């Protein structure tokens, strides 16, 4: 009889392991991976899809199975092990009442160990590491159990719903649980550390998260750097400009840069000249296409949607007074995700961030404060300006080359000035000895 009971104990432990492994596997498996396997013709994946589509019901089935097998294991296992151990303690001349207690303690410990290790921990570990294989193997048996136990599962689920409603709580489906942006960032970081995604993928997805927070004024070409063409300029005069600037599109002004009336595409003008439709003595006014104007504080995601809708590649940004603050191109927006894009004419273009050494950089004055913070792991803040050059000017209004500021353990040095504009700033993280030396010099 005890042999039969031991076999039943082993079966109950195996069933516990089955339900535990099934529970963790169906939670762990990715829906996109299941869809891929179904597309490849994997029939087992269809059963997995059915289970994950009705996740709440099948998780309840797993919980019911674990509970039933655990109760059965406690009732049957402890009494069986206790009966097997009791004669051993009697032979050791342990008093009867004491041998019964010791047998019970040993039986309880053995069953608990087997239940936790063999029935819970080991299956859970396997299911987490091999979620795909486990879910493929166990999906069909789990469906059979669900069908058999459906009345009980239905009763338990509805009883749980009534209980939660009695406390004024709504039942939340497992499928309705969504990750916040911060949670997704943590998952992304962990996936990168574990090697599931590479550095480029990690960088792109992070940039997409940051994309929503970017404003047009943070990525614009400022008014002072806009190369615009007068609306009445001759094509021959335009040729002299485009040989130097080498842009494909130019904003067209009427009077000054505060009155941008449109944009021209050089390809369109040159094609018309080559075909003989116009002469080089004609003005560019007939080639002016509409351009959109938006406030400089517009989010770049909204601006991109508007540019796609209007089918334009350039937008003029206006300040609060209606003047031109700068311009943004589709390329500028895309670069916020994929990084810097350079064409065949950008060979001599200098990178905005040049690394000199460890913690030592030359920064373009137009680099955003947020980028500098991320680069150096510091927390510079200023609500009035967006760029590092602007930040320096708010700290020290009358600046000259080689002027320096120490902030957040870093030294910022004016590397180059272009008129009233900070062109380049050298920044380096200071060691503790350098910080102490600088502090002593300032006190002296």
UniProtKB/Swiss-Prot annotation:
It comes from the Bacteria. Residues 1-201 form the CNNM transmembrane domain. It holds the Pfam family CBS. It is a multi-pass membrane protein. Its main location: membrane. InterPro entries: CBS_dom, CBS_dom_sf, CNNM, FAD-bd_PCMH-like_sf, FAD-bd_PCMH_sub2, Ion_transp-like_CBS, Transptr-assoc_dom, UPF0053_domain. GO terms for cellular component: plasma membrane. The keyword Translocase does not apply. The chain crosses the membrane at residues 7-27, 61-81, 101-121. Residues 220-282, 284-344 form the CBS domain. The keyword Transmembrane applies. It is found in: Cell membrane. Keywords: CBS domain, Cell membrane, Membrane, Repeat, Transmembrane, Transmembrane helix. GO terms for molecular function: flavin adenine dinucleotide binding. SUPFAM superfamilies: CBS-domain pair, FAD-binding/transporter-associated domain-like. Belongs to the UPF0053 family. This is UPF0053 protein YhdP. It comes from Bacillus subtilis (strain 168). The lineage of its organism: Bacteria, Bacillati, Bacillota, Bacilli, Bacillales.
């Amino acid at each position: 009889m005890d042999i039969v009971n031991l076999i039943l104990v082993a079966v109950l432990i195996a069933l516990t392991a089955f339900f535990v492994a099934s529970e963790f596997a169906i939670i762990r498996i990715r829906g996109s991976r299941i869809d891929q396997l179904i597309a490849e013709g994997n029939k087992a994946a269809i059963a997995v899809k059915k289970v994950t589509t009705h996740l709440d019901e099948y998780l309840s089935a797993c919980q019911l199975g674990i509970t039933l097998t655990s109760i059965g294991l406690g009732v049957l296992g402890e009494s069986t092990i206790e009966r097997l151990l009791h004669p051993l303690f009697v032979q050791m001349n342990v008093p009867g009442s004491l041998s019964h207690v010791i047998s019970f303690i040993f039986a309880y410990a053995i069953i608990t160990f087997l239940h936790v290790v063999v029935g819970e921990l080991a299956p859970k570990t396997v299911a987490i590491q091999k979620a795909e294989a486990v879910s493929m193997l166990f999906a069909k048996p789990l469906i059979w159990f669900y069908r058999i136990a459906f009345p009980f599962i239905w009763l338990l689920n509805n009883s749980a719903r009534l209980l939660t409603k009695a406390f004024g709580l709504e039942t939340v489906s497992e499928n309705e649980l969504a990750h916040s942006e911060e949670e997704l960032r943590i998952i992304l970081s962990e996936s990168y550390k574990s090697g599931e995604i590479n550095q480029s993928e990690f960088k792109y997805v992070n940039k997409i998260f940051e994309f929503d927070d970017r404003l047009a004024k943070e990525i614009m070409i400022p008014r002072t750097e806009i190369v615009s063409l007068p609306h009445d300029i001759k094509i021959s005069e335009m040729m002299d400009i485009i040989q130097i600037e080498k842009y494909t599109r130019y904003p067209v002004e009427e009077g000054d840069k505060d009155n941008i009336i449109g944009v021209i595409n050089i390809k369109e003008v040159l094609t018309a000249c080559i075909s003989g439709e116009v002469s080089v003595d004609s003005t560019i006014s007939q080639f002016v296409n509409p351009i959109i104007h938006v406030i400089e504080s517009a989010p770049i995601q909204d601006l991109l949607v508007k540019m796609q809708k209007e089918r334009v590649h350039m937008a003029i940004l206006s300040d609060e007074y209606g003047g031109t603050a700068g311009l943004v191109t589709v390329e500028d927006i895309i670069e916020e995700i994929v990084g810097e894009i350079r064409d065949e004419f950008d060979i001599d273009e200098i990178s905005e961030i040049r690394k000199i050494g460890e913690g030592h950089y030359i920064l373009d004055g137009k680099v955003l404060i947020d980028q500098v913070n991320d680069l150096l792991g510091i927390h510079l803040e200023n609500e009035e300006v967006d760029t590092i050059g602007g930040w320096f000017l708010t700290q020290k209004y009358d600046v000259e080359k080689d002027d320096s500021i120490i902030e957040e353990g870093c030294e910022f040095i004016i590397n180059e000035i272009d008129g009233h504009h900070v062109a380049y700033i050298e920044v380096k993280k200071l060691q503790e000895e350098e910080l102490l030396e600088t502090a002593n010099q300032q006190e002296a």
